[in-house]
């Protein structure tokens, strides 16, 4: 056992962040901590790292256990070199009698710094290399031998190379197990899937305020759905019992005999339990912020077309001879290391910068472009939240309808009492929601999203994805959130930072190109790629093969059989014996999921065959 939290609680002002939370960390554990913004994840991490103290409960750790904490934001002294930053936190000598300089050299080598980088100013490093330097400082502070590493939002502002390095660093095997146990707060779903061996979600949706699942994020999603479904069924069953109690009580108890008193007490207890479980179910099904981007509803085939564009700054070539077209339904992802030219390409496409060669052709009238930038508009720290949301008056016009600032704020999960509070009191996620609220007020033909995921929690990320899927215009997306790129991008432009680029149909192919100088050639012409629920191929009608026609002839019978299986599975979940047995209920839920998936697959295949036939 490396660390144990026993029934710890913490409040912020009058609001309870979490109550009586318990957690145990053993060697080899890699624990991902998730939850909505404001749930207290970072506070919990600081308590585990002994940076803060809990209001109640205790943290137990053997004295021999060494742990290090890597905060979200780094702080290096002004003018410090890479080596200076690490030496500043290294012990004079470690257990092996190594001096500070040697300890620092080992730390820097371990995180990938070459010797010719040691004298670089820390202030000149990219986000990914600053994270490596923070990690080197943490390792150095304990003589390079931590048992436990705690990280707060470690992938924020990292490029894909930095994220890949961090994943390798945390999962590196030594002696058959991970080199370090780790606990990390993150909203990066792919990172959670690649690294975590256990997921902990802090939320009011669960008894005790926490749900723990062994396995990665994909396993967590499955188990969480089972839990929420089971809790909903439990509420229904309990509500039936309470109704029976009410009928019995309405008849009037004859006296107050011991047996009747017990029944009354049991009824009261059931009502309390029902109230609690309904509150948890409400928390579990909260939809979060209501994100809907507005479009001009223009159906122009091509909104922006780049023909042979190139751009360089001095000898630094960013892209050359690039052809790219943006039309309704397109979502083009831009991928490359920090400094490879993604932001510059956006500026050229949107007319803010002129290309060195080639031309940009726009639709007539010019497309309306709305930009969500990672370098977001700064509000004065004293600006009240209400003014930040509605800068002109106490009302906004959204899709032709006037809304009061109170209603508009609630749409983004802000409480009424927050409207008069300064924006300086908001968390990073709350500020991100303010900026989303601002750009939702502008109707767009083209949405440009430059790192929109920073500071957003997973529920808001998923809502943002849904809204972008439904947006009828074109989208340019710059993000290191691999899950979002995979779900949304119809094409991905890969910039290698040397003036070359390639257009890929999938994220996996784009990552392979980034990771290899000898990657296979990918066609660089601007060919739209089919993306489910986003765009359809513009190919002409296709004649069905004999095999496809046979499949189409028999698919309706298969669909009817699949729907009957779904109905049977639904009926099984209403069986009292199943509801009373967790194992049977889990199996029944799995059968239902599989039946629904098969039905959905057959309907999708039917649509596909009919489209090919027409």
Annotate the PLM regions.
Residues 1-233, 288, 293-614:
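ABC ATP-binding cassette signature C-motif
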């Amino acid at each position: 056992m490396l660390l144990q939290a026993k029934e710890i609680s913490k409040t912020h002002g009058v609001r309870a962040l979490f109550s009586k939370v318990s957690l145990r960390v053993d060697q080899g554990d890699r624990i991902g901590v998730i939850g909505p913004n404001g749930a207290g994840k970072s506070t919990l991490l600081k308590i585990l790292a002994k940076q803060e103290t809990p209001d109640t409960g205790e943290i137990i750790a053997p004295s021999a256990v060494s742990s290090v904490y890597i905060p979200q934001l780094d702080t290096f002294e002004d003018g410090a070199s890479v080596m200076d930053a690490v030496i500043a936190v290294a012990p004079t000598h470690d257990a092996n009698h190594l001096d500070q300089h040697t300890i620092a050299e080992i730390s820097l080598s371990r995180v990938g710094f070459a010797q010719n980088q040691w004298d670089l100013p820390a202030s000149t490093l990219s986000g990914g290399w600053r994270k490596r330097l923070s990690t080197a400082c943490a390792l150095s502070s304990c003589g390079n031998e931590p048992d436990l590493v705690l990280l707060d939002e470690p992938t924020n502002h990292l490029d894909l190379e930095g994220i890949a390095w961090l994943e390798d660093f945390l999962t590196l095997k030594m002696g058959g197990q991970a080199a370090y146990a780790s606990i990390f707060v993150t909203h990066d779903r792919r990172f959670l899937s690649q690294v975590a061996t256990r997921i902990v979600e802090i939320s009011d949706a669960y008894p005790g305020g926490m749900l723990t699942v062994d396995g990665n994020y994909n396993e967590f999603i499955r188990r969480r759905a089972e839990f929420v479904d089971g809790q909903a069924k439990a509420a229904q069953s309990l509500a039936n019992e309470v109704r029976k109690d009410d009928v019995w009580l309405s008849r009037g108890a004859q006296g107050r005999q011991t047996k009747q008193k017990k029944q009354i007490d049991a009824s009261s207890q059931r009502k309390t339990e029902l109230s609690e479980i309904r509150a948890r179910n409400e928390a579990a099904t909260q939809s979060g912020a209501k994100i809907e981007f507005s479009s001009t509803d223009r159906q122009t085939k091509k909104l922006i077309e780049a023909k042979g564009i190139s751009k360089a700054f001095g000898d630094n070539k960013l892209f050359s001879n690039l052809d790219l077209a943006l039309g309704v339904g397109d979502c083009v992802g831009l991928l490359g290391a920090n400094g490879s030219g993604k932001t510059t390409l956006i500026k050229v496409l949107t007319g803010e910068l002129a290309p060195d060669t080639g031309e940009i052709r726009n639709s007539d009238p010019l497309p309306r472009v709305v930009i969500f930038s990672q370098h977001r508009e700064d509000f004065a720290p004293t600006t009240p939240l209400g003014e930040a949301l509605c800068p002109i008056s106490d009302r906004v016009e959204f899709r032709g309808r006037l809304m009061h600032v109170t209603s508009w704020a609630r749409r983004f999960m802000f409480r009424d009492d927050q409207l008069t509070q300064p924006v300086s009191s908001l968390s990073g996620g709350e500020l991100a929601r303010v900026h989303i609220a601002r750009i939702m007020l502008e109707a767009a033909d083209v949405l440009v999203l430059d790192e929109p995921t920073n500071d957003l929690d997973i529920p808001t990320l998923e809502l943002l994805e849904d809204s972008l899927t439904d947006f009828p215009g074109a989208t340019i997306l710059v993000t290191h959130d691999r899950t979002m790129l995979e779900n949304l991008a119809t094409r991905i432009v890969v910039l290698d930072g040397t003036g070359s680029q390639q257009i890929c149909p999938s994220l996996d192919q784009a990552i392979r190109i980034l990771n290899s100088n000898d990657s296979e050639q990918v066609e660089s012409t601007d060919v739209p790629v089919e993306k489910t629920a986003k765009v359809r191929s513009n190919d002409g009608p296709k004649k069905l093969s004999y095999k496809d026609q046979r499949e189409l002839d028999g698919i309706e019978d298969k669909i009817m059989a699949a729907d009957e299986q779904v109905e049977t599975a639904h009926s099984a979940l209403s069986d009292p014996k199943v509801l009373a047995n967790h194992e049977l209920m889990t199996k029944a839920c799995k059968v239902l999921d599989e039946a629904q998936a098969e039905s959905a697959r057959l309907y999708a295949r039917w649509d596909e065959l009919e489209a090919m036939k027409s």
